[in-house]
Amino acid sequence: MKNFVFISPNFPESYWKFCAELKNNGLRVLGIGDCPYDQLKQELRDNLHEYYKVDSLENYNEVFRAVAFFTYKYGKIDWLESNNEYWLMRDAKLRTEFHITSGFMESDMDRIKLKSAMKAYYAKAGIPTARYHLVEGYEDALEFAHKVGYPVVVKPDNGVGASNTYKLKCDDDLRFFIDHMDDNIYIIEEFVNGHVETFDAIIDADGKPIFESGNVTPHSLMDVVNNNEDSIYYIVKDLAPDIREAGIKTVKAFGVKSRFVHLEFFVLNADQEGLGKKNDVIGLEVNMRPSGGFTPDMYNFAYETDVYKIWADMIAFNKCTLNMDRPRHFCAFVGRRDSREYELDHNAVLERYGYCMKLECRLPAALATAMGDQVYMCNFDTEDDLQNYFRNLIRKKGE
């Protein structure tokens, strides 16, 4: 029996489904986390062979000892994953220490975690990226900003999501940022006038996709977080050919095997000198894990499938055992803010869209910053219905 160590299997909450499908496929699933065992969801407990509680997942020595214990008790560890951006570097260090060769090792991490290091691999794939500079201080950042022109975007070179990401519009903005910059290494990039589309896939051990999807984010996540805007995005009914082509090239250039990926691209809204023509695809960043939040469930809603099983099939059999010839839909996400009054209140939304509502729920404050306080997910068969849904749900009272 193969041993699979799942780091932090309780977060996100839906990750128990990965564990369940691994168990169904005959793997011994061993969990490591800092949540007390009796506070784990029953569904997770039912699908873990054993759980090792540490005081803190931030304490590497504790987690190392947990993996060592499982190795002593059950033999060689075949897989170790968290499927979580925050722990990717930790995962790779543990794989390296315990010679677990089924995933990225410590030596691989710069190219998949550092935004500056990703640029060379996008170039290898033949995909352009925004010009950039690693910030040392005000003078060098100012020189770069004047070279490419404002606005510019600054963000941690090793960051997650839109955290500490800012659009700077003038020298004064840049000075303020430099004066208040934390200890992170920051990358400054030319602003790209585009919207984000993704290539999301489960890649097998041969570097081939066994599941493909993508999502479109009409509004910048940076603006959603920094301006407290409504959050909207959707799973595509059919993946655009140019996004698929860019995704496949990126997978090959980065040497991706045996994992879920969420690869982000800009699609230019207009011609941009030095980057390309309107609708050209530009590399943004790679994420070597599933797209966050509710997205895995939204794939399932959109394609009437089960990505938790497809991923576990990849782990166990290096192939998909499901019939993928199923109806396909758009699946649209809207996250609304409690601080705003909307034309359609909560009950009106449920009344109008109950027929196609797949999920609605409240989010805790920790997640609401990026996703909204109240979220709704609906399936649609046409883009017109999808866009009307977005307009209706984010229209403010009196507009």
Question: Which role fits each region the language model picked out?
Answer:
Residues 312-399:
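Peripheral (often C-terminal) accessory segments that flank ATP-dependent C-N-forming ligase machineries
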Residues 102-114:
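Short, acidic/small-residue loops that bind anionic groups at enzyme active sites
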Residues 111-193, 205-208, 233-245, 391-397:
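Active-site nucleotide/adenylate-binding loops and adjacent lid/helix of ATP-dependent enzymes
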